């Protein structure tokens, strides 16, 4: 993460320039962390990096904290109800950074620490793709964002269609909520089962 230090930020920027020269697509998960930097610094740095990004992942407060773009009011109990402002925020990212051809976002309505509804939306060009809502009682809320990003990249490499891609990605994310510790130790078949059944209770 470029939040670690100025030298790390410069290294990231050099890598992004290299990617652009070689035509390599770049995925960025904004994933703001208040313990690592303040919002002003984050926005200055991320605005310098975003012109090299082709796919951006932005969730909850990431829009405003990392880019100064409003999409979410901070109320985690009604995240899914705010889908229209999420859409507007995603479109604003592509307007401000025209190199960014796609934006993905996870929406959550959390009723307790463990219980909540999860879904995702995916913008490519001017077309939105939405997933079903998954109701989840989390075993451990760690790594769901990483699981989402990893699944999204996996589907992009497989060149799956956008709807399948985002459905697979949110299924991987909610499945991770049922697994302890950092790693999403599941198979592609496990994730597909969740996609088809909307049931995150893992059976192997």
Can you annotate each of these PLM segments?
Residues 129-198, 202:
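Conserved post-catalytic alpha-helical subdomain immediately downstream of the catalytic base
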Residues 1-128, 134-135, 187-193, 202-204:
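Ribokinase/PfkB-type carbohydrate-kinase core domain
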